[in-house]
């Protein structure tokens, strides 16, 4: 695979953005010009370059809007939204940085400006949560000429470890709407504006989050918008794959797509550490203080490690690397939870992910779906960048959409005429 940046981490995040170009999230020339202004491993240059490009796209959108060019304005606003999102992404080692929230708000605002000019419709929704808080959501509805017969099948899409609701559009609604599916996406605790504005932290028992989301989608939105609650799927990618499987134990979920999700977060992180170090800490032979000191020293010379632990501390609401490791132990599907899933399930893996392997995750997840027969569960392992081999199918979103919706069509009995 061609490297735009020498480091795997920066290259992956660049491809993550460039891969949205088919769905209005980026322009190839703009991305290449922006990459030329970024110093590999330098989050400040990353922020400045993408923020400047977001402002340029915003100006183009305003210019198009002023002359009545709806498509030009929509595309410009949506690109600006994605560039704003990318700009703050690598600042998460210092979550108190005010640029994180301001860029996230700018991303959401630009996205909404663009979407009202596109085919189809979207409704902004607030989901009642806990402690008087709400979770921001969007219901995307297909245009009438894309709708299938009968009620509208719906996909409830959850984010993951580091996504925002605006980014979720490229993975879900962009493929769903032309195929006649509605999509409901949301920022849960630890995600998007729920984290940045409301300081709600990620939780392992995601079924408690999606239970409230399903209450609202089924009880409030479905009757008004003709949604088919008997053809309701849940979808998530990367950590969202884990979260979607937590949601799938709810009997109201009729199908689930878990894209490249982990089986056990702690096991993945543990496998990347020297055995003497992690086992010494687990046994108590090495103290929290020593563990934290070692991680902090390594992070001072390895930006990817610094970002991973910095972002983890933020989304989990903890203070130290040792606290991160203890929290990760709660994010596991190894306790028999998968046996609770009774709905048809599509599991995917990424053979070329630099985070974790299908052998660690996709295969044991698939094998642990003990309540499902062979016809009720399906496994797809993507290989190479063009074949869905990168984490969350980065760079192969069209293929992911094809695989996912072909499987959902079959599962939900949706028949389409040959073209």
From Swiss-Prot:
Family annotation (Gene3D superfamilies): acylaminoacyl peptidase, alpha/beta hydrolase
InterPro entries: AB_hydrolase_fold, FrsA-like, FrsA_esterase
Active-site residues, Swiss-Prot/TrEMBL: 238
GO MF annotation list: hydrolase activity
Domain of life: Eukaryota
Pathway this chain belongs to: Mycotoxin biosynthesis
Assigned keywords, A-Z: Hydrolase
E.C. designation(s): 3.7.1.-
Keyword Hydrolase in record: yes
Function: Hydrolase; part of the gene cluster that mediates the biosynthesis of the mycotoxin lucilactaene and the lucilactaene-related compound NG-391 that act as cell cycle inhibitors with potent growth inhibitory activity against malarial parasites, moderate growth inhibitory activity against cancer cells, and no activity against bacteria and fungi.
Family under the similarity heading: Belongs to the AB hydrolase superfamily. FUS2 hydrolase family.
Name of the protein in its database record: Hydrolase LUC6
Source species: Fusarium sp
Gene name for this UniProt entry: LUC6
